[in-house]
Amino acid sequence: MSRNKPLAKKLRMAKANKQNRRIPIWAYAKTNRKLRYRPKPRHWRRNSLKL
C-alpha cells in the first residue's frame, strides 16, 4: 500500500489496529475473568479490512 494515505483512511486503519490488540490484564482481573479474549480477532493476512 502506498505511503501517502488520506487522513480518514489512516485513522480508520489505526482504530482497526487498536481493536486487534489483546485485552489488558487489569481488565481481565477487574471483570473477574469475564472478558477472556478479543471480541473481533483479525489476522493481517487472512482477513481484509473493508475500508
From Swiss-Prot:
Keyword Kinase on entry: no
Keyword annotations from UniProtKB, A to Z: Ribonucleoprotein, Ribosomal protein
InterPro entries hit by this protein: Ribosomal_eL39 (IPR000077), Ribosomal_eL39_dom_sf (IPR023626)
Domain of life, per lineage: Archaea
GO molecular function, one term: structural constituent of ribosome
Gene3D superfamilies: Ribosomal protein L39e
GO terms for biological process, alphabetical: translation
Family from the record: Belongs to the eukaryotic ribosomal protein eL39 family.
Annotated protein name in UniProt: Large ribosomal subunit protein eL39
Species in which this protein is naturally found: Methanobrevibacter smithii (strain ATCC 35061 / DSM 861 / OCM 144 / PS)
Gene: rpl39e
